[in-house]
Curated annotation (Swiss-Prot):
Swiss-Prot/TrEMBL catalytic activity: GTP + H2O = GDP + phosphate + H(+)
Organism this protein belongs to: Novosphingobium aromaticivorans (strain ATCC 700278 / DSM 12444 / CCUG 56034 / CIP 105152 / NBRC 16084 / F199)
HAMAP family according to UniProt: EF_Tu_B
InterPro entries: EF-Tu_GTP-bd, EF-Tu_GTPase, EFTu-like_2, EFTU_2, G_TR_CS, P-loop_NTPase, Small_GTP-bd, T_Tr_GTP-bd_dom
Any single Gene Ontology cellular-component annotation: cytosol
Protein EC: 3.6.5.3
Recorded family membership: Belongs to the TRAFAC class translation factor GTPase superfamily. Classic translation factor GTPase family. EF-Tu/EF-1A subfamily.
Region (G2): 60-64
Keywords recorded for this protein, A-Z: Cytoplasm, Elongation factor, GTP-binding, Hydrolase, Magnesium, Metal-binding, Nucleotide-binding, Protein biosynthesis
One GO MF term: guanosine tetraphosphate binding
Enzyme type, top EC level: hydrolase
Top-rank taxon, per record: Bacteria
Ranges where the tr-type G domain occurs: 10-207
This protein's name: Elongation factor Tu
Length: 396
């Protein structure tokens, strides 16, 4: 039989399974592909193939991640599943696998466990917009009351991390039953109910072109007779010739007008997210703009120097530091296209941070950077990456 090609005519969404070790994340991932394969929306991927996820290196960090894809009647999904807890931490902090939403898997017999909490906290810190819960292994619990208690506990836990615990859909079932094709009421039916909840509850992410215009500046040229050209890859939005933009970061914010957009030496009327362009800007001298700043739609983003962040510190094996760092550590923070020196404030009660740790840090930069919550960065020492982080809260 010829392999059916996925038609990309449905909206696309990136999701993943999160939760405590052995609560059934990988079994659930396999079960989703099995149930949807029967409906023509996936290729079945068995447990073993998801579990032996290949190692990938993302910005020098070793992460094992399995990727499967499938579709429901409404959407096309790319789904990530990680074999180990450390892989989740790294994945969520580096944004190696962007998640527009996640399925939190909780074993009904155990209830929430330490990594359940940690994954919910990480999801909150790195800005995963929505969670749906799958209460797994319900056939191992005889007492309906216990299921109700576990559900209550999960909802309270979600609320304590600022997720809408009362509203989040919780689907009960057995991923193994679905995978083995038995007990449809807790097997296949629960998978269909879960996917319906994911379709309905996880919001469709805005396309990059629908967001406000932002382009990190990579290079600046002066073209005689024409003026100053800045080059870079448009991160989000659309820029049309004649529109006003702000130049933000490192120095005081300046306003200018884009008088020309060119790509591959051709003049265009507009550039959009993903395009590598040169933008001709009016009335700005070459020395007034530099790499590390951004061009952005006026009012859409502001420069900041102080923030807190969720950070993963590379282990020695990953080429990171061999020794811990302490309070007043001053590395470089690499945002988009440039390094800015910053000072680290450790959380209350933390004396030092070891290679391989993940930690919440407060940072004070010596120069402002255009940032929003959710912005990713690398921590570097003399050009070598020693950590990866995401802005979780802007303080100044």
């Amino acid at each position: 039989m010829a392999k059916a090609k996925f038609e990309r005519n449905k909206p696309h969404c990136n999701i993943g399974t999160i939760g405590h070790v052995d609560h059934g994340k990988t079994t659930l991932t396999a079960a989703i592909t099995k149930v949807l394969a029967e409906q023509g929306g996936a290729e079945f991927t068995d447990y073993a193939n998801i579990d032996k996820a290949p190692e990938e290196r993302e910005r020098g960090i070793t992460i094992s991640t399995a990727h499967v894809e499938y579709e429901t009647a409404n959407r096309h999904y790319a789904h990530v599943d990680c074999p180990g807890h450390a892989d989740y931490v790294k994945n969520m902090i580096t944004g190696a696998a962007q998640m527009d939403g996640a399925i939190l898997v909780v074993n009904a017999a155990d209830g929430p466990m330490p990594q359940t909490r940690e994954h919910i906290l990480l999801a909150r810190q790195v800005g995963v917009p929505a969670l749906v819960v799958y209460m797994n292994k319900v056939d191992q619990v005889d007492d309906e009351e216990i299921l109700e208690l576990v559900e209550l506990e999960v909802r309270e836990l979600l609320s304590s991390y600022d997720f809408p615990g009362d509203d989040i859909p919780i689907v009960k079932g057995s991923a193994l039953a679905a995978l083995e094709g038995r007990d449809d009421n807790i097997g296949k039916d629960s998978i269909n109910a879960l996917m319906a909840a994911v379709d309905a509850y996880i919001p469709q992410p805005p396309r990059p072109t629908d967001k406000p215009f932002l382009m990190p500046v990579e290079d600046v040229f002066s073209i005689s007779g024409r003026g100053t050209v800045v080059t870079g890859r448009i991160e989000t939005g659309i820029i049309k010739v004649g529109e006003e933009v702000e130049i933000i970061g490192l120095k005081d914010t300046q306003k200018t007008t884009v008088t020309g957009v060119e790509m591959f030496r051709k003049l265009l009327d507009q550039g959009e997210a993903g395009d590598n362009i040169g933008a001709l800007i009016r009335g700005i001298k070459r020395e007034e703009v530099e790499r590390g700043q951004v061009l952005a739609k006026p009012g859409s983003v502001t420069p900041h120097t102080e923030f807190s962040a969720e950070v993963y510190v590379l282990s020695k094996d990953e080429g990171g530091r061999h020794t811990p760092f302490f309070a007043n550590y001053r590395p470089q923070f690499y945002f988009r296209t440039t390094d800015v020196t910053g000072e680290v404030v450790l959380p209350e009660g933390t004396e030092m941070v070891m290679p391989g740790d993940n930690v919440t840090l407060a940072v004070k930069l010596i120069a402002p950077i255009a940032m929003d919550e959710g912005l990713r960065f690398a921590i570097r020492e003399g050009g070598r990456t020693v950590g990866s982080g995401v802005v979780s809260k802007i303080t100044k």
